[in-house]
Amino acid sequence: KPWATESWHEDVEGYELWDGDQLIGRFFLDMHPREGKYQHAAVAQIRDGISGQQAPLATLMCNFPRGDELMEHSQVVTFLHEFGHLIHYLFAGGHHWSGVSGISTEWDFVEAPSQMLQEWVWDYDTIAQFAKNAEGEVIPPDLLDRMIAARDFGLGMGTRRQLSLAA
């Protein structure tokens, strides 16, 4: 839910994540570009949580269009990927082991929650609930099928490269 607090810029919005009456964490959404701002999408830890004493605090930074401009599919993938990191951090950031969990975990796992979350934009039933063009029309199923085919083209070559790097 919205969190009424000050932030470093008027465009930045604060939110709280609750589970019933228990505060899980707080976060800022810094979604739009501006002069001097970090140019990529990322989640930054602001304050670790301390079990029973303080909730974790983080920010999700992106550079998406303002106002009525529509987001591109790749931007939605990016948002959900980074939001996965944010949720991972918040849910793991308020207990005794928060320093070695959430986005502070081993590199072979740190991307897992965010990669799972970003997959939702490749599922037609999910994307049809929110992905609309300027006229309010839902993305056609055949267009998403073609986007998936384009994404998957040459996937084996990328896997082969990663295997060669691991050798």
Spans of model-derived segments:
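Cation-handling catalytic/transport regions enriched in His/Asp/Glu
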Residues: 1-166
